[in-house]
Amino acid sequence: MDFEDDYTHSACRNTYQSFNGMDRDYGPGSYGGMDRDYGHGSYGGQRSMDSYLNQSYGMDNHSGGGGGSRFGPYESYDSRSSLGGRDLYRSGYGFNEPEQSRFGGSYGGRFESSYRNSLDSFGGRNQGGSSWEAPYSRSKLRPGFMEDRGRENYSSYSSFSSPHMKPAPVGSRGRGTPAYPESTFGSRNYDAFGGPSTGRGRGRGHMSDFGSIHRPGIVVDYQNKPTNVTVAAARGIKRKMIQPFNKPGGTFIKKPKLAKPVEKMSLSKSPTKTDPKNEEEEKRRIEARREKQRRRREKNSEKYGDGYRMAFTCSFCKFRTFEEKDIELHLESASHQETLDHIQKQTKFDKVVMEFLHECMVNKFKKTSIRKQQTNNQTEAVKIIEKDVMEGVTADDHMMKVETVHCSACSVYIPALHSSVQQHLKSPDHIKGKQAYKEQIKRESVLTATSILNNPIVKARYERFIKGENPFEIQDHSQDQQIEGDEEEEEKIDEPVEEEEEEEEEEEEVGEVEEAEEVGEGGGVEGVGDTEEGGDVEGEGEVGAVGEGEGEGEGVGEVEEEEAKEEPVGFSVDQAEEN
């Protein structure tokens, strides 16, 4: 029979003859006679004929749905060898040409199938059954693919009578080396209509489902295959659902982990009074903080003597001087008010609070002035300290005392010469450092203000200040002496404490700030610390002034230090509670 006969007139007759046992070979899969072995015996009979007629002439189920015509024509594994050079019974998805078989003829057959567009709607190349890498296709399972009861069209199980007749999978791993055992997931290669797998094809483009192509031939309906397919689908669904289910679970696990430390913290705060372990930890923390403050005082004393405690300071502006006039001018200056405004803006403090903070600085200045008056009479001690300063210096060392100017912004000492100071003022380093130091002062002033207000002693005084009383008035001499020492040391330590907080974050910056504060006063020497708004501290005077301060410190300074040692306890406790 000629292959060029009309399709609709010859297909049924040819197939009918083949079913009657005639040993004929008609191209499309060589369904020619009953001598073909399909693995499960021969297939034929009236039912197959009816299925064929429904498929060939009715064409009522060409979308790949369920029913008796769900499966495409069946071909044996080696049927390709019996095909002719040109087969009109094969669709446009041609596998009968060697070059297409070798390079994976996906689309691109010489004849276009009328059902190509409808088949493409079922999904991508991987879903339609390409020979692309197996894991990629399995990982891209689609919900629509799993929910369709006509999914047998997509499964290679539905296209073969036995697993041994399935084509060898080909993917990125090479021929015959599937990524997963095909017995587990089922090969999703749909090069099922003749010969081994067709290779890589054209990449990851769309590819239609060959199982749904309607061609003349025997339609084999495997009734038992959907169960296996659904098992594979169930596996895929389960694997798919586990991943998104675990993600919320993972976050759930994290939440209790985050909540547990919070509970511990809350428990550790409440039973602090009763639990001895927590009390011991709190005591250790307080002792460690006190020890740190004590070491800082000792270091400053070694560097500059106790005179650094005789300086007038503004904790907010990091201003330090040994002259009363300078501190008075500073407390009334625009730079000091600007710092207070910045604190109020950042902390949203009330105006009354800002007035109280300013009064704290004024009171601190007054107490320092009183302390200096009490120590002015100790001149002999000053001479002794002065000797110690120049101890070991001989003429061969070519050393002498000179006046210097200390720049806190740059942390350098400049000779007290007009030319040297002017040169430094115009230097790029100073211009840059001046702005950076000003911003640093603003940042630290906020921390200082909050740390002062968190002190329980200051809180009590603030309550009195709100009531209109004088919070700094001496009520009980013994108590007030301790309170005054506490507050003074607290406000002096406000800077170190604040630096302690920043030490945990920026240790280097803290060191510079601390040194700038303390060295500034040492370099301030006997007396003039005119601080310009630019951040320049002109500490004019002789180094002997440091000795003078040190001598004074030996007398009352020791008493004040004893008082100061008690103060950090209250402050540290409060700070520890804060942390």
UniProtKB/Swiss-Prot annotation:
Residues carrying Omega-N-methylarginine: R173, R235
Ranges annotated as biased composition (Acidic residues): 483-520, 529-541, 549-565
Annotated segments matching region Disordered: 154-194, 248-302, 470-579
Keywords linked to the UniProt accession: Acetylation, Activator, DNA-binding, Isopeptide bond, Metal-binding, Methylation, mRNA processing, mRNA splicing, Nucleus, Phosphoprotein, Repeat, Transcription, Transcription regulation, Ubl conjugation, Zinc, Zinc-finger
Transmembrane feature ranges: none
Modification sites for Phosphothreonine: T251
Residues modified as Phosphoserine: S48, S56, S63, S69, S81, S82, S91, S106, S114, S118, S121, S137, S212, S270
Region (Mediates transcriptional activation), start-end ranges: 1-124
Disulfide bridges in this chain: none
Subcellular localization: Nucleus matrix
Example GO BP: regulation of RNA splicing
Compositional bias of kind Basic and acidic residues: 272-290
Cross-link (Glycyl lysine isopeptide (Lys-Gly) (interchain with G-Cter in SUMO2)): K140, K240, K247, K254, K264, K401, K459, K467
InterPro entries: AKAP95, ZF_C2H2_AKAP95
Function recorded in the entry: Core component of the DBIRD complex, a multiprotein complex that acts at the interface between core mRNP particles and RNA polymerase II (RNAPII) and integrates transcript elongation with the regulation of alternative splicing: the DBIRD complex affects local transcript elongation rates and alternative splicing of a large set of exons embedded in (A + T)-rich DNA regions. May play a role in neuronal differentiation and is able to bind DNA and activate expression in vitro.
Protein name as catalogued: DBIRD complex subunit ZNF326
Phylogenetic lineage: Eukaryota, Metazoa, Chordata, Craniata, Vertebrata
Gene it is expressed from: ZNF326
